[in-house]
A protein has these predicted regions:
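Globin-like tetrapyrrole-binding proteins
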Residues: 1-140
């Protein structure tokens, strides 16, 4: 199996066990990055949490499937967060919180193929985010 197959399988498993990882992602994210909590203080900001997690999953899948617009998704992601002064450390904390929440929800280990695939793909996404941040007005 390759990364796309492992990642799609993990998403199917999450659906089968009917676990919403969003609260777990943000619990871990805020623990690792408490300075981000005030950015989600409004009801509107809290409402987008699920959207952000879903967009992350979709972006990874789209990149793996070679969708032509996937590079634009990363540009949009960084641009959308520019005004919030989101730094690379916040992206790092969010990506780690996501994969850790998936790992725990699926009761996997760090060495399971699904988690290795997620970490590899999120690492590549992080590189693209960092490159995009370098050209934006947000602090790195």
């Amino acid at each position: 199996m390759n990364d796309i197959e492992y990642i799609l399988r993990s998403l199917e498993q999450l659906a089968e066990v009917d676990i919403d990882v969003v609260p777990c992602v943000y619990e871990r994210f805020f623990a690792a990055c408490p300075e981000a909590r005030p950015l989600f203080a409004t009801r509107e900001a809290q409402a987008v949490q699920g959207k952000m997690v879903n967009e992350l999953m979709q972006t990874v899948v789209d990149r793996l499937e070679g969708k032509p617009y996937s590079a634009v998704m990363v540009q949009t992601m960084v641009s959308d967060h520019d005004g919030w002064r989101v730094r690379i450390a916040m992206y790092d904390a969010f990506l780690d919180a996501f994969v850790t929440a998936v790992r725990d929800a699926l009761q996997c280990t760090e060495t399971s193929p699904e988690i290795i695939a997620w970490r590899r793909q999120l690492s590549m996404l992080r590189q693209d985010i960092a490159a995009q941040l370098a050209t934006s007005t947000a602090p790195v």
